[in-house]
């Protein structure tokens, strides 16, 4: 595309002839056709028509590939190259870089007679002379394969001239690498100087001026102008000019026969910047399309102001709100696929063949935001390119391996170091401002982010993540409490999709500098008790240093590890849920929870965490009790880790993903193995009242009546904080039942709140629930948590026991009533009916369900009931329990009415219409029959009503569930962070 003499490629000259390059100015010399950088190019993309017989341009033959762009320019000056002209091969970081980073390739046409012609080999020599800084990354150029010859006779030869220069290729590769190192690492400006001088030196060779052979402008002026532009726009076009250079020789020719270097597809792929006035930084440099195929290929002028710019170039400048690639600018383009790099089919893609484009797109750019941009030890890393955007598959692979291998390596502080730093930071006051979590992730250098949000292959991510996780866990847990380590049951490999992982990390980790999402201790959301914090996309707040070691809950949102709840039973009613162990020590006097005055670091809710803290319950917040379902939290630290794991009543962390609890407490991973069964837990801090009311809602949906497990609610002796945590578990498909853990239950460790059944009698029912709440909080015994899905069977057993206990209590109460009072036979019949139905239910369905639950907990059982099976059976069981509950409810009403039948009133009301129909003689029998029928009708109506309610609630839950599940999986569906 850049005018190449047909002869240009015909006999490349070795570097030793470099001096001749300067001297060969005669038309006979293979003067490179230099497009004048300031050539007035029309702003519209110019497809420079190949100049037809340009034989006179070069004695050796008409131009082959480089026909015309120069002539097209309004002012086709002789693109003579001034000594100062900058070559585009060097990445230019200087803002002054000219709009067109002309390629040395452009050196193809003899400028006017007076134009200084640089021999193409001069570039090679120059490259050899220039000290190439090793970047540490070597990309092997691979032959692109022959491309169609350009229209000009010499087209075939010209490309070869370029491709034949290995030093040229190496130089291009290094230039690209350096460019990325510069633009993305933003290493010290001093390092960039080589771009300036080298660029200048090259520019002299690199033909900065675009000019047609016929044009006769002063070469040097164009050249200098261009050079300045280079410096001004190097950040943006350094790459382009670089690849442009390559294009001229290696790439545009490559189309014909060149080599594609691994960096070939980089931003400057399309030499065309269309649609900009030449003076503009992005001014169009229209390389003559060497042949129709190129022209057809895709020089579609972009219609935007930034048209023709590769996102990689402009994205950096735009990424941080106009900040030129500073700090983590790249993470905005983090996982962008190659096609994302080039917005539209604009010049960015212009010269790439479709195959190359496809190839380019297949790889994600591996962009490693330099965390602190200082995080990389500068020593010895001069050439290293933190941004691995080289697209060749082997290159990426190598880079990925390298990075996964040294994920803990120098480029980023190792997770252990980060963990230690984090721990020390935690101990030292953590800037509380961050507690507000709302800091956009970008603002923090994310030096601690383990993955650098690299989009590696999933395998690499898994390996890297595992390594980092192990390192972090090792250091964190070592620094945290060893007990945490005990509870920590990290799965060997977190199966996570790279994008969800990146997303999680970005959301959780990138938020704070060293707030390793892993270690990001929840910022102690300052103890404004009543406030509800919406940690919706904020990074987990870093807790004030005073907080206890954070609980690390790593929720990798692996689709397979959908919901892991870690329950930790806590004994000790007076346990404060001190979200942080630190809280344990100081007792928050005012707090009913004995919360340490230290603002408990509310466990960093996953980005979607909404923490509602009950006024006194700072710790509740830390308990993350109200954690609204957290979609995929990357790595989350729950500061709730209570040292008194045993005392902390069970903390549960539902994270849709692997969640590691630091607590020794049976922090078990509850992992529902089916991807679709991702259980989402809404932990809601609710007062007992809420518990009682909620418990009776949607029986079918909220199976787990407030399973008031005294969940780490350290209810101080007074148990004043009788807030129970409701976890509404949405089982992705069907039920959303609520568990209220804090209910301390009675002796039966499984004393869940009566739960589903409506409180039958206000006295026994609600009173009972309250009493349960107040009864000492007893942690459930460790029911073997070894089952694959312990939570499912175990939870249902607990709920079942609560129901059984409730029903037995009612039966005993009614039996005592029957014994203590002389009740009418009708009432006694009702009592016997209720008690008999209850006993039958307990002896049959309840036993059956209990066996199913046990079976689900038994790994050896062959048909292991799934969570859905248990939930479905539980739902059916609830129907029977509801029937029995209705009977007891009726008995409670009778008792409230001094055991006087309420029915007679109804009989008086109901019979009158009936007698009207039948003869009075049969009135009495009809009345009796009507009474019976009324009773049956009433029962049937109740059943129908219950069924309708259940169905409606089920549909509602299903709808909400489906919505939730959609949200859950959105992260996995997205490929951008």
From Swiss-Prot:
Residues 53-73, 202-212, 258-271 have a biased composition (Low complexity). This is Disks large-associated protein 3. Residues 74-85 have a biased composition (Gly residues). The keyword Kinase does not apply. It comes from Rattus norvegicus. The keyword Repeat does not apply. GO terms for molecular function: amyloid-beta binding; molecular adaptor activity; PDZ domain binding; protein domain specific binding; scaffold protein binding. Its main location: membrane. It is found in: Cell membrane; Postsynaptic density; Synapse. Belongs to the SAPAP family. Interacts with DLG1 and DLG4/PSD-95. GO terms for biological process: modification of postsynaptic structure; modulation of chemical synaptic transmission; protein-containing complex assembly; signaling. Keywords: Cell membrane, Membrane, Phosphoprotein, Synapse. Expressed in most brain regions. Residues 221-245 have a biased composition (Basic residues). Residues 538-547, 754-763 have a biased composition (Pro residues). The modification Phosphoserine is found at residues 58, 404, 407, 410, 414, 641, 643, 930, 933, 965. It is a peripheral membrane protein. InterPro entries: SAPAP. May play a role in the molecular organization of synapses and neuronal cell signaling. Could be an adapter protein linking ion channel to the subsynaptic cytoskeleton. May induce enrichment of PSD-95/SAP90 at the plasma membrane. Transmembrane segments: none annotated.
């Amino acid at each position: 595309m850049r005018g190449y003499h047909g002869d240009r490629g015909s006999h490349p000259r070795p570097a030793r002839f470099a001096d001749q390059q300067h001297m060969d100015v005669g038309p006979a010399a293979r003067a490179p056709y230099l497009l004048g950088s300031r050539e007035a190019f029309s702003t519209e993309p110019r497809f420079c028509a190949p100049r037809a017989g340009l034989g006179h341009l070069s004695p050796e033959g008409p131009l082959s590939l480089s026909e015309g762009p120069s002539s097209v320019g309004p002012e086709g000056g002789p693109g003579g190259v001034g000594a100062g002209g900058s070559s585009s091969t060097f990445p230019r970081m200087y803002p002054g870089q000219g709009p067109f980073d002309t390629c040395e390739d452009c050196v193809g046409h003899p400028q006017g007679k007076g134009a200084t012609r640089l021999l193409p080999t001069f570039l090679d020599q120059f490259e050899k002379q220039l000290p190439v800084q090793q970047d540490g990354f070597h990309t092997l150029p691979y032959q692109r394969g022959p491309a169609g010859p350009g229209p000009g006779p010499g087209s075939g030869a010209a490309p070869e001239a370029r491709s034949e220069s290995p030093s040229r290729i190496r130089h291009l590769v290094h230039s690209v690498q350096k460019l990325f190192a510069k633009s993305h690492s933003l290493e010290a400006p001093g390092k960039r100087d080589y771009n300036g001088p080298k660029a200048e030196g090259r520019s002299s060779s690199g033909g900065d001026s675009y000019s047609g052979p016929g044009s006769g402008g002063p070469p040097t002026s164009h050249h200098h102008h261009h050079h300045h532009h280079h410096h001004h726009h190097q950040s943006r076009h350094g790459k382009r000019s670089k690849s442009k250079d390559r294009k001229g020789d290696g790439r545009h020719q490559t189309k014909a026969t060149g080599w594609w270097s691994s960096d070939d597809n980089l931003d400057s792929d399309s030499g065309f910047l269309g649609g900009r006035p030449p003076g503009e930084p992005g001014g169009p440099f229209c390389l003559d399309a060497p042949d129709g195929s190129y022209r057809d290929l895709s020089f579609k002028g972009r219609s935007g102001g930034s048209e023709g710019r590769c996102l990689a170039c402009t994205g950096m400048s735009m990424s941080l709100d106009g900040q030129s690639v500073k700090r983590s600018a790249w993470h905005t383009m983090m996982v962008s696929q190659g096609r994302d790099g080039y917005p539209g089919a604009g010049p960015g893609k212009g010269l790439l063949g479709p195959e190359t484009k496809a190839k380019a797109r297949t790889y994600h750019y591996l962009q490693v935001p330099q965390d602190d941009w200082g995080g990389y030890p500068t020593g010895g890393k001069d050439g290293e390119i933190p941004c691995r955007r080289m697209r060749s598959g082997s290159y990426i692979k190598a880079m990925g391996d390298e990075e996964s291998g040294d994920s803990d390596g120098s480029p980023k502080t190792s997770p252990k170091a980060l963990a230690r730093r984090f721990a020390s930071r935690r101990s030292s006051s953590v800037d509380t401002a961050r507690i507000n979590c709302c800091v956009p992730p970008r603002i923090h250098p994310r030096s601690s982010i383990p993955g650098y949000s690299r989009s590696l292959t999933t395998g690499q991510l898994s390996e890297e993540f595992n390594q980092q996780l192990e390192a972090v866990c090792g250091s964190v847990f070592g620094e945290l409490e060893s007990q945490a380590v005990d509870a920590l049951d990290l799965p060997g490999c977190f199966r996570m999709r790279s994008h969800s992982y990146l997303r999680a990390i970005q959301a959780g980790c990138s938020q704070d500098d060293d707030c390793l999402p892993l270690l990001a201790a929840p910022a102690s959301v300052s103890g404004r008790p009543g406030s509800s914090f919406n940690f919706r996309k904020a990074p987990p707040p870093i807790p004030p240093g005073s907080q206890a070691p954070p609980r690390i809950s790593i929720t990798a949102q692996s689709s397979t590890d959908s919901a892991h709840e870690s329950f930790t039973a806590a004994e000790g009613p007076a346990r404060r849920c001190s979200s942080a162990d630190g809280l344990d020590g100081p007792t928050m006097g005012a707090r009913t929870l004995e919360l340490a005055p230290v603002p408990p670091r509310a466990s960093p809710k996953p980005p979607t965490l909404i923490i509602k803290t009950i006024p006194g319950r700072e710790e509740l917040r830390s308990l993350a009790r109200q954690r609204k379902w957290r979609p995929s939290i990357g790595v989350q630290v729950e500061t709730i880790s209570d040292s008194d794991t045993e005392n902390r009543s069970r903390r549960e962390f539902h994270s849709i993903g692997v969640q590691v609890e630091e607590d020794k407490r049976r922090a078990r991973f509850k992992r529902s193995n089916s991807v679709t069964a991702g259980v989402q837990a809404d932990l809601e801090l609710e007062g007992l009242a809420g518990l009682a009311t909620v418990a009776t809602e949607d029986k079918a949906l909220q199976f787990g009546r407030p399973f008031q497990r005294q969940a780490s609610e350290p209810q101080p002796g007074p148990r004043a904080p009788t807030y129970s945590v409701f976890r509404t578990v949405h089982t992705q498909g069907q039920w959303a039942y609520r568990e209220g853990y804090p209910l301390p239950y009675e002796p039966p460790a499984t004393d869940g709140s009566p739960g589903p059944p409506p409180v039958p009698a206000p006295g026994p029912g609600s009173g009972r629930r309250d009493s349960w709440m107040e009864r000492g909080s007893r942690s459930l015994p460790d029911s073997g948590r070894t089952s694959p899905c312990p939570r499912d069977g175990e939870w249902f057993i607990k709920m079942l026991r609560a129901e059984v206990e409730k029903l037995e209590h009612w039966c005993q109460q009614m039996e005592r009533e029957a014994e203590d009072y002389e009740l009418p036979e009708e009432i006694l019949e009702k009592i016997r009916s209720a008690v008999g139905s209850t006993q039958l239910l307990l002896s049959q369905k309840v036993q059956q369900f209990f066996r199913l639950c046990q079976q689900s907990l038994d790994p050896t059982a062959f048909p292991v009931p799934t969570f859905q099976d248990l939930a479905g059976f539980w739902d059916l069981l609830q129907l029977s329990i509801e029937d029995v509950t209705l009977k007891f409810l009726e008995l409670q009403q009778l008792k409230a009415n001094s055991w006087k039948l309420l029915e007679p009133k109804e009989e008086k009301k109901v019979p009158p219409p009936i007698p009207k129909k039948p003869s009075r003689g049969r009135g009495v029998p009809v009345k009796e029959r009507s009474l019976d029928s009324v009773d049956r009708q009433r029962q049937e109506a109740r059943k129908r009503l219950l069924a309708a309610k259940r169905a409606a609630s089920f549909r509602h839950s299903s709808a909400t569930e489906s919505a939730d599940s959609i949200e859950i999986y959105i992260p996995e569906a997205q490929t951008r962070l």
